[in-house]
Amino acid sequence: VVQPRCVIAPAVGQRGNTVPSSTLDIHQLESLRDVYRDLHANPELSFAEHRTAGVVAAWLRDHGFEVIENVGRTGVVGVLANGIGAVVALRADMDALPVAEDTGLPYASTVRAASAGEYVPVMHACGHDMHVACLLGACAELVGAREEWSGTVVAIFQPAEELAQGAQAMVDDGLYDRVPRPDVVLGQHVAPLPAGTVGIRAGDFWAASDSLRVVLYGAGGHGSRPETTVDPVVMAAAFVMRLQTIVSRQVAAADTAVVTIGSLNAGTKANIIPDSAELMMNVRSVDPEVRSRVLAAITRIARAEAAAAGAPREPEITLFESAPTLTNDPAAMARTLPALASVVGPERVIDPGPIPSSEDVPILATSIGVPLVFWLLGGADPVVYAGARTVEEMQAVVGRIPSNHSPLYAPVISPTLELGISTLVTAARVWLG
């Protein structure tokens, strides 16, 4: 959940003049709204974004982009060369989540798909469908205004952000050997802030994310004779409780860290003590030193609890997903910020402070040593925020409305779509000649 901390100018919780002018006509905008509804109704899981990639590739070709498909498995890249000038990368992610939608929208997803050996519901619960629609609209607008700028636009439609693997997959697949090297990477993420609001800050912005699998090994046996066993369930329970002390006792109050145990699985029957217990957990952090300290503490505690229980072998600890801290380049942000403010108005640009959400988009910039500028795009109906004029009042609203990853979450289409197009276009035009 995004918690606004600092308002660069007083936030306005009302509609106001939040739909910017655009070179796209009413028919093009309605077409993009249809694209959004279609993507929302047809979500696809990470690295399975085949239909979405097809929609993207067809749109880009129809608008004169050179298109490269299957980059990093299901990624799509569009290149629009328009004379001499800077190369600007604009990025959107495409994947959805294994969530059963409960929005009640007429275009709500009823999709189910295979995932890890089972069929699961699928939903665009994080707004990636809006990201795709906004970037497609930005591409169309940049084509329509190509006589007003020069340079090259690289539109990156990335798979598998939810696994924190898609950006690296595209880089490893030779993304930057196949397109012009960008001078800057720009992107946005929809959030439950009022539509017409942009959230951004220089420096560390989004937390790093690390997901781990820990297997604790015991010695199974009959539930009536626990003295003949080493019970991994009790071991896991002690491990979970001890993990709660990492943030409260080993991380300074001024630092940011979160340790969450998302699943604990052990056993098959009530009267059987199993041989092992598996835990899945996620760590969020901002400072690299804090990140290292928390990960080291998890390993130390797992081994110590196993030793205390008399486990027959050491635990197995696997890091299977990892995303770096998202850091906005201060100079690049200072250059881009006035453009964003020109779209929504300076009074609607807020500093939300460091947030514990994570993104793998930094890899697209750090892998080639170029700056990143990334912002939050408000997607909640501004009416919900009517009368909220202080940070505290905005926080109260954020806390009671659906947020990303909720089965109830969906951004309001307008003015979110129009503003998302304009923020991308206006930010890109700052860098293009």
Regions found by a protein language model. Give the residues of each.
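Histidine/acidic-residue-rich, glycine-tolerant segments that coordinate divalent metal ions
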Residues: V77, L97-V99, P106-M123, D129-M130, ...
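Acidic/His- and Gly-rich active-site-bordering loop/insert found
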Residues: P20-H124, D129, A133-G137, E141-S150
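Divalent metal-coordination and catalytic microenvironments
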Residues: L39, G78, L90, H128, ...
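Short, flexible, mixed-charge acidic loops at enzyme active sites
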Residues: A100-R112, G203-A207, T336, A386-R400
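Metal-dependent amide/peptide-bond hydrolase catalytic core
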Residues: V234-G433
